[in-house]
Amino acid sequence: MLELDLQRATDAATPDDAALRAWCELALRQRSADSEMTIRLVDEAEGRELNHTYRHKDYATNVLSFPADVPDELLDIPLLGDLVICVPVVEREAAEQGKSLQAHWAHLVIHGCLHLLGYDHIEDDEAEEMEALERELLAELGHPDPYADDENDSITH
């Protein structure tokens, strides 16, 4: 079971709780243990501040992942970590890349959850594995390959 804390720190339109939960559960289904995580939906100012504080980048990015660093045995429910998603960046990217907003949201939530599970895309082989899993999960939802046009790669971090 997934214990999901959803925090909306913006008045912008965002996917509903059920959609956010469904995307997380899809990405986390390989994990058999109960899990706890937070998704915080933020505006451009908070997104920029967090990206600057934690990554020393002076711009808002689409999704930030903060994996928990607490041993599972110390918790009642293992804490995966937190995702911070910058709503205006997601909206802007979807429009610029000609993607449906729903598909882009699903991609970024799944992408962030995979980071919480330890996936990464720094090395080419890691990126290939992570992107293949993202493609598979998004296809199950009926969404197109988010990497079909590499010039419009949606992951900016």
Swiss-Prot record:
The species this protein was found in: Pseudomonas putida (strain W619)
The encoding gene: ybeY
Alphabetical UniProt keywords: Cytoplasm, Endonuclease, Hydrolase, Metal-binding, Nuclease, Ribosome biogenesis, rRNA processing, Zinc
NCBIfam families linked to this entry: rRNA maturation RNase YbeY
Cofactor binding summary note: Binds 1 zinc ion.
Class of enzymatic activity (EC top level): hydrolase
Annotated GO MF terms: metalloendopeptidase activity; RNA endonuclease activity; zinc ion binding
Necessary cofactors: Zn(2+)
Subcellular location: Cytoplasm
Keyword rRNA processing listed: yes
Protein's recorded name: Endoribonuclease YbeY
Pfam families linked to this entry: YbeY (PF02130)
Annotated function: Single strand-specific metallo-endoribonuclease involved in late-stage 70S ribosome quality control and in maturation of the 3' terminus of the 16S rRNA.
GO BP field: rRNA processing
Homology family: Belongs to the endoribonuclease YbeY family.
EC id: 3.1.-.-
Coiled coil ranges: none
Principal location class: cytoplasm
Lineage, top ranks: Bacteria, Pseudomonadati, Pseudomonadota, Gammaproteobacteria, Pseudomonadales
PROSITE patterns found in the cross-reference section: UPF0054
A GO cellular component annotation in the UniProt record: cytoplasm
HAMAP family per record: Endoribonucl_YbeY
Residues binding Zn(2+), per UniProt: H111, H115, H121
